Amino acid sequence: MSDSIVRTPWKDYMGEVPMHLEYFDGSMFEAVEQIAKKYPGNIAFTFMGKSTTYRQMIREIEQCAKALKTIGVREGDKVTIAMPNCPQAIYMFYAVNLVGGIANMIHPLSAEKEIEFYLNASESVAAVTLDQFYNKFEKVRERTKVVNMIIASVRDALSPTIKAGYMLTEGRKIEKIPEDAPVIMWKDFMKLSHSCYYKTYKVKREGADPAVILYSGGTTGTTKGIVLTNKNFNALGQQVIAANPMFRVGDKMLAAMPLFHGFGLGVCIHTMLSQGGRCILIPRFTAKSYAKQIVKYKCNFIAGVPTLYEALLRLPSMDGANLSSLKGVFSGGDSLSIELKKKFDKFLYDHKASIQVREGYGTTETVTACCLTPPHMFKEGSIGLPFPDTYIKIVEPDTDREVPYGQEGEILLAGPTVMKEYMNNPEETAQTLRTHADGLTWVYTGDLGVMDEQGFIYFRGRAKRMIISSGYNVYPGQIENILDAHEYVQMSCVIGVPDPYKMQKVKAFVKLAQGVPATEETKQVLMAYCRKNVAKYAMPYDIEFKEDMPKTLVGKVAYRQLEEEELAKIKAAEEK
């Protein structure tokens, strides 16, 4: 389209980054396969010290695809993947794509009720998870359409030396799966490829075909499945590399952001594998392990949420570390405070890195990032400039009327990474995706921001009531619904409390049902109930009992008042 139709003040400030690209129109697997044919001997990823070449990876993906065909997975079928960043997750993700299926990506630490919801909402016919999560899946399986449950183990992907150590430590803690359990163990599953008699197990898919389902709160804060296409992911890969002209084939990305997150899957995994990079897979994040891998592998690119960078600053093991290999350090998932950016930029300088942290912004409705601070031009507090072929408007909230430069409004996004739809939800799809007179389909983000005269974007806040804890989106309404369902609870309200490490932590206020005592025992009953029904990252750190909830004039719970009261408590405690 002509840039004259949409205001693009950023076009003169892109530096080496082009305004437009030609996009690959095949499947995600085909994008990776092209690279594998070009650089078969290059390392695709390294997992706990064991490296896999592109040639080996493609062979494993094709074997996995044949096994999927053997168990009956067909074009358009959904397969749920609930895995950490490990080789089997990568093989399964691309194998599902290869047979024409749709990968339904979920958090392996999800609570039982959430797993049941994800399996049913997607109508998944198969699911793959780790042995340590087997029990949660087995408890809900009979209430879903899942025919085949595939169980992998981290130990199967380890080198013999590392495996021995793993089995003496972490491996000992995992409960043994019964021999007669109705599951297929990973090794047995892969052997099923020998029984695949389909000549055409590879299904040709187009760029516009649905390929992945990721989950987010949508515009109302209730969980929505976001349907993303092959082109969404392939375009993102090309955009990310275009926005980083310093990238070279073989460059290493530390992949600690999880696979069920657009940032982790889209940037840390698919961008690297579709453009010739190398992923250093981190299955379970700790700041200590993250820091160790950066130094050990001389990583070129790292990505994380602000809490990660806050943690790295405090690590004694980083003293004297040489980070001169770094070409790009990206922050997303939450606002990066000016103070933290300054601290981490100094940290990078002190550790011989000649770069700064570059902040980005995006939504799951656009896979992940759609704008990024350019490497040649930093503006304090800005989240950067749009990627090639991505357009950003700032409008009066919920309208198509653009506001002047420098004025706050709702952030709208358009471009090749815009989702296909919300799964089975045409009403919210229509509310979020709207076509304007310029012919573009725009995502109404519900986020507030400002654009300056040079096209730099400044994030101002989330219009929706959402808590961000360690980069994860936590929707208060979901936790309130769970709490309110307990017989002890009459009413609840959940808020985010500022936390120096997590940015925000979750706190619940509860008005108890008549006759229920406000005791420590009652609190522990409710905390145990939450642990069973709420994902680990969304778990309230505290429950406070209230005789009554503050209300607004229209009778709604005044959650902002509770937030203000909590902030006042924190301030008073700090002044003591």
Where are these regions (language model features)?
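Conserved AMP-binding A3 loop
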Residues: 53-55, 202, 211-235
